[in-house]
Amino acid sequence: MMRIAIVGAGSIGGYLAARLALSGQRVTVIARGANLSAIRANGITLRLPDGTEERAIPELATDDLAAAGPHDVVILGVKGQQIPALAPTLGPLLGPETAVVPAQNGIPWWYFQRCDGPYAGHRLESIDPGGVISSHIAPERVIGCVTYQAAELEAPGVVRFIEGNRFTLGEPDGVKTDRVRALARALTRAGLKVPVRSDIRTEIWVKLLGNMTFNPISALTRATLGEVIGYAPTRELVAATMAEAQEVASRLGITFAITTERRIQGAAQMGSHKTSTLQDIEAGRPTEVEWLVGAVAEVGRLVEVPTPRIDALYACLTLLERTSCSGRTDHGSPGTKSMVDQIYEKERDHA
């Protein structure tokens, strides 16, 4: 039985850890603060949509990565903007064959790794500033994933599961390896639906179309998904912004099996749901703006596709984050400037 470490026991990390532990698998939870104290004392309480609760006890809950030691799989359950600071600390969890599964929204730092084409090996500065992530997590360790769970961390050690049990996996090079199949079996035993794709990047873009439009628009307007879609001008903005992103993706060889309208209709079923970005802004937390929006704008420049709507949403959301996150001096990855600041600095340098 493989040992799986979940780094970050927030809503998604906590949900995955609970499901794996409840299915009898060896799970280590890497957490900190009040959340760690609660998990050590009472395990993870999983609140289900029918009102029932389950309590999961992981094999180990700790903030000491050296004490946890090497694992077969490390799932990164933190937000994307936390990974640049986290990556240099992961060494104690990584053995020679350890796989790393980043469970973040947006374009992942490894997107142009282990692939062919004119952009193979390209690094996205917006999400991997200075190469800090890729220099500490070797490309061959990565298994790509796309998560579809909606959950909330209601209190330390308490996760409310809302919906969604799909957790798509795929090697960046498209090979269905023994390790990705083994992880899929483990997650399937935990009650998740786990397709293994030979082209994980297409599924990344399908989900991203929603995240990079609905999330910033909802945060800027303080509106739910239903309100964004129900108001004709913002619905039109969503569709036009999705079209920009689709053009960017098409330059990378991505094709979409569903139309923009179907994608919008699917989101409409979420009704009064608040996007995670809106929740972050309301709580004064940093958002995933670089991963959801900034990276798309950066890829647009790389493939020479104009993205005026994406650029506008990005500029507005980065400013909103800057003014909403109390005591925060930056609004991108730790220790870095946002892509907006970098672009304007370059323009000033050449003025």
Residue positions per predicted region:
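NAD(P)+-binding Rossmann beta1-loop-alpha1 motif at the extreme N-terminus of oxidoreductases
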Residues: 1-49
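Nucleotide donor/acceptor-binding cores
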Residues: 2, 72, 165
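Generic preference for hydrophobic
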Residues: 29, 60-61, 169
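Rossmann-like NAD(P)(H) cofactor-binding subdomain of soluble oxidoreductases
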Residues: 54-154
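Internal alpha-helical scaffold of NAD(P)-dependent oxidoreductase catalytic cores
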Residues: 93, 134-207, 219-257
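NAD(P)-dependent Rossmann-like dehydrogenase/reductase catalytic/cofactor-binding core
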Residues: 227, 235-351
